[in-house]
Design a protein with these regions (language model features):
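Short, acidic, metal-binding catalytic loop of nucleotide-sugar glycosyltransferases
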Residues: 83-95, 103, 118
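Active-site-proximal specificity loops/subdomain of glycosyltransferases
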Residues: 102-149
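Conserved catalytic core of nucleotide-sugar-dependent glycosyltransferases
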Residues: 142, 161-229
Length: 229
């Protein structure tokens, strides 16, 4: 279901009809898709939550593991389970999913919503740390404690299509050095006066350009073993 919405949304983003764009028809359509997705995807997740294939298997690897890492804060934690669900449903499952939280914001795990805590049975690991490194938590602690593993950092407010990890791993094989890659890219766009336009108005790069410019990511970032952002 998520992949369907993703494909639908992307097809509208690539439309360039001047009149429809000026009338903001595409913006309205994209808004409707986002609303519909935010209503139906949670329902679908709840109805299929007991499917065993949507859990991490666990393994014997001690290094070279694929670790998905993220962090969050109180304003977003209630819907964070949806992000985790999308990660548990990947076509190429990670070995670990780690959520790093600050004790300044969550003094103990009991303060977290049940919807999130229940995901520990399916492979989610949650760690509390002193202080607050903000968004840097998701890679600082992972690099410190799992230096020999592959790290994929994700955000706490995005539904990730099932092919996310699979495509990142395939893309990483093209490069022999630590690199940040993504599936979608946007080019910084200016108006006629040279002023930078809002991000939502930046033009997406063509497929030919994407092969040359791989450091500007939109959805996720990927760091091979030993890599640093």
């Amino acid at each position: 279901m998520l992949d369907f919405y993703n494909s639908w949304y992307a097809s509208i983003q690539h439309e360039e009809h001047p009149f429809l764009k000026k009338m903001r028809i595409y913006s309205v359509l994209r808004f409707c898709i986002r609303v519909l997705a935010n209503i139906t995807i949670p329902i679908y997740y709840v109805l299929t939550i007991n499917n065993k294939k949507y859990s991490l298997l666990g393994g014997e690897l001690k290094s070279g593991r694929i670790i998905v890492t993220l962090t969050s804060f109180p304003a977003r934690v209630n819907r964070l389970w949806l992000v985790i669900e999308s990660l548990l449903r990947q076509s190429h499952k990670p070995d670990m999913i780690i959520l790093w939280l600050s004790k300044d914001q969550f003094s103990n795990l009991d303060l977290l919503p049940r919807s999130l805590l229940k995901l520990r049975k399916r492979g989610l690991q949650i760690f509390l740390r002193e202080g607050d490194l903000r968004s840097y938590k998701k890679f600082f602690y992972t690099l410190s404690e799992y230096p020999n593993d592959v790290m994929i950092t994700v955000d706490d407010d995005i539904f990730y299509p099932t092919f996310t990890i699979e495509e990142l791993l395939k893309e990483s094989l093209k490069y022999s050095f630590p690199v940040v890659v993504s599936r979608y890219f946007s080019a910084i766009t200016q108006d006629n006066l040279g002023n930078c336009l809002p991000y939502i108005e930046w033009k997406q790069l063509t497929d030919k350009s994407r092969d040359k410019i791989f450091f500007w990511f939109r959805w996720w970032n990927f760091i091979p073993s030993g890599g640093i952002v």
